[in-house]
Every structure is written in C-alpha cells, then in structure tokens.
A protein has these predicted regions:
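Basic, helix-initiating cap at the start of DNA-binding domains
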Residues: 1-32, 36-41, 45, 58-65, ...
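C-terminal peripheral helix-coil segments that are non-catalytic and often amphipathic
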Residues: 2, 139, 143-242
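Alpha-helical structural segments
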Residues: 16, 20-27, 62-82, 97-104, ...
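Amphipathic alpha-helical segments that line or abut small-molecule/effector binding pockets
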Residues: 23, 92-111, 135, 139-149, ...
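Short amphipathic alpha-helical interface segments enriched in basic and hydrophobic/aromatic residues
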Residues: 30, 76, 80, 103-107, ...
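Short hydrophobic/aromatic patch on the recognition helix
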Residues: 48-57
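Helix-loop segments that flank and shape redox-cofactor active sites
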Residues: 81-89, 121-124
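Short helix/strand-bridging catalytic loops that position acidic/His residues to coordinate divalent metals
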Residues: 117-130, 211-218
Length: 242
C-alpha cells in the first residue's frame, strides 16, 4: 500500500505558521470582531514582517474566507459526527442529534458562530467556495427529510405540492450544492427547519432570548428541547408509541 509522501521541512513550517496566523486571527474575532481583522496587526503580534504574512494570505478577505470555511467545516463535522452515532433507522433521533450538535457547537464557539451567522463584515463578499461547507448541515437535514419521505413519514400531498414549480425556482441557487433529484418540496421542507434551527440558536447566542426565556441555562435547554420536538414531528412525523 502506497502512502502519501512525507511533508518536507518547508511544508511543515508553512503549515505551522499558517496555523499560528489562523489562531491569532481567531483571537481578534474574540476581542475585536471580524471587521477589525488586520493582517498587519496579526503580523505584528506574531513578530513577522507584513510582507512575510502576505505570502500566506494575500489579503484580509482571503484570511476571512479561510476562517469562514474552517468554521463551517468544524460545525458540519460536529453535526455529522453526532448524527452518525444514532441508529440509521431512528430518524427522529438522528434529527434531534443534528439540532443539538449545532447548538452545542455554537455555544462552544460563539466567535466563529458570529463570523458565519452574525452581521456581515463590511466590505467583504464571501466567494462561492464557502457555499459547499456552509451546506453541510443543510445536506444532513435534507438527507433525513428524504429518508423520512421514503419511509412514508411525510404526507404525500406535501411531496407533490401544487406550488412545486414556484418553490423550485425560489430555491434554485442552493439546489446545485445539494444532492440531485430531490423534489423541490422536500428541499423546501428541510430549508424551513434549517432556518428555524439557526434562528433559535442565533437568538440565544446574540441575546434576543433575554427576558423571553427563563434563565439560567436550564430554561433555554427546555425551550430548545421543545423546539426540537416540534421540528422533529414536522420532519419525521409524529412519534409512534410502542
């Protein structure tokens, strides 16, 4: 079996310095926010010449893009790992695990979450290569939705919706990043839950639930658990008692 060639000393050094730059940038996200991110300031903090840092990232926007992709991939990996521990036939359990993993990741990584789901960074336009990483959770929710429909858990009229053509046109931008052949109403169904999920998580992280949901954490936990229960019924159908 042929393995990959070992990295050269130069490649290892580049990887280490790149990691240091990204760590420093995440520090700025925590203390100053994404709009204040500056390659010159990071270079100064790392004891590097600005010209040297530009050999790793050509611009602030390129660094932001890397941070955004890394954050989306970290979130997606966390959701996929949690969902992957649940029995494949337990659609409700897989859906609930995905939702819980999203919230847990967001609470553990508030600055990265704010970067990808908070206020847009002035002057920055995310390139197309951020879309696929951003779609990982959506794809996971869609997969569960499709399996629920195949198992007869989604009403037939919801799959063959009379409004399918307008829906298909409306969601055309995201469909190219999702598994092909899925009926538009099912994509719409998954997107509805996706926006609900991230809306609730964003409200919690950004303080909009203050004076709405009881503190301490137990109150927010109970509120989120009830949201999951209702979303699960929408996606996988009502729980069948044994």
């Amino acid at each position: 079996m042929t393995g990959s060639a070992p990295r050269t000393a130069r490649e290892r050094a580049r990887a280490e310095i790149t990691a240091e730059i990204l760590d420093a940038a995440r520090g700025y996200l925590a203390t100053d926010g994404a709009p204040a991110l500056s390659l010159r300031a990071i270079a100064r903090d790392l004891g590097m010449a600005s010209s040297a840092l530009y050999r790793y990232f050509k611009s602030r926007d390129e660094l932001l893009t890397r941070l955004i992709i890394d954050a989306y991939d970290s979130l997606g990996a966390a959701a996929e790992a949690c969902e992957g521990t649940i029995d494949r036939n337990d659609l409700a359990g897989r859906f609930a695990a995905t939702c819980s993993a999203v919230r847990d990741w967001a609470l553990a990584h508030p600055n990265e979450y704010a970067l990808i789901y908070g206020s847009p960074v002035p002057g920055y336009a995310a390139p197309a290569d951020t879309v696929r990483p951003a779609s990982r959770v959506t794809t996971l929710l869609l997969r569960i939705t499709v399996e629920a429909a195949a198992a007869g858990r989604v009403p037939e009229e919801d799959i063959k919706d009379a409004e399918a053509e307008p829906v298909a046109a409306a969601i055309a931008p995201i469909r190219s990043y999702l598994p092909p052949g899925v009926p538009a109403p099912l994509v719409q169904r998954a997107l509805m839950v996706w926006t609900n999920l991230f809306g609730v998580v964003s409200f919690e992280l950004f303080g909009q639930l203050h004076n709405v949901v009881a503190e301490p954490r137990a109150g927010r936990d109970a509120f989120f658990a009830e949201c999951i229960r209702r979303w699960t019924t929408f996606i996988t159908g009502p729980t069948v008692s044994s």
